[in-house]
Amino acid sequence: MPFIFRYSFFNKALIFWYTILMKIYKTINHIAGENTYYLVNDQAVILIDPGSNGQEIISKIKSFEKPLVAILLTHTHYDHIFSLDLVRDAFDHPPVYVSEKEAAWLSSPDDNLSGLGRHDDIINVIARPAENFFKLKQPYQLNGFEFTVLPTPGHSWGGVSFVFHSDELVVTGDALFRETIGRTDLPTSNFEDLITGIRQELFTLPNHYRVYPGHGPSTTICHEKNANPFFH
């Protein structure tokens, strides 16, 4: 892992410490092209949004040779939770964190959208309950990871984003994509809420922060402010 070294002088003594940078990896799932993210530091792995390629996700986690300590969900549409229980069972049931507003959707195909008629080609997704509900705008510290959960509803009722200030990045789920935004024609979607959440919670982050969305390529806050047609 890379290191940042800092120093200062106090009472003629050298104080020396370091910060270990997190690395982020992505795999793309075959259903809906959903992005699953893996956050890795020197201690552990955090998984975000386990999509449909369950065995690939499990193999990727094992390749890091570190414990999986948490699974974070940006929202609970089926393409973001498809392999949730498969991954839990493969890694001794790490705790799952979810928005309280969408917690019941984990076991409801109608609410997580896998039960819609247009999705007859996939199984109904039914997952076990999550262990934890997010506390919005409260800092989290998990095995060396530090992040804050931001409310970004609009694509779904309880959608959230995760900002890692030390690593200058934000994972936005299906709220903000490169040069577009999440769909707002789904149950519980609301266009005005989505635009407001992006403006208030994401566009107030530093311009250079990297954006990792639930589908498609990464981008930056600056690029989306300047090039996203929904904000011009």
From Swiss-Prot:
Zn(2+) 2 binds at D79, H80, D174, H215. Binds 2 Zn(2+) ions per subunit. Zn(2+) 1 binds at H75, H77, H155, D174. Its cofactor is Zn(2+). SMART domains: Lactamase_B (SM00849). InterPro entries: MBL_Glyoxalase_II, Metallo-B-lactamas, RibonucZ/Hydroxyglut_hydro. GO terms for molecular function: hydrolase activity; metal ion binding. Gene3D superfamilies: Ribonuclease Z/Hydroxyacylglutathione hydrolase-like. The keyword Cytoplasm does not apply. Keywords: Hydrolase, Metal-binding, Zinc. Its EC number is 3.-.-.-. The keyword Hydrolase applies. It is an enzyme of class 3 (hydrolase). PANTHER family: HYDROXYACYLGLUTATHIONE HYDROLASE GLOC. Belongs to the metallo-beta-lactamase superfamily. This is Probable metallo-hydrolase M6_Spy0554.
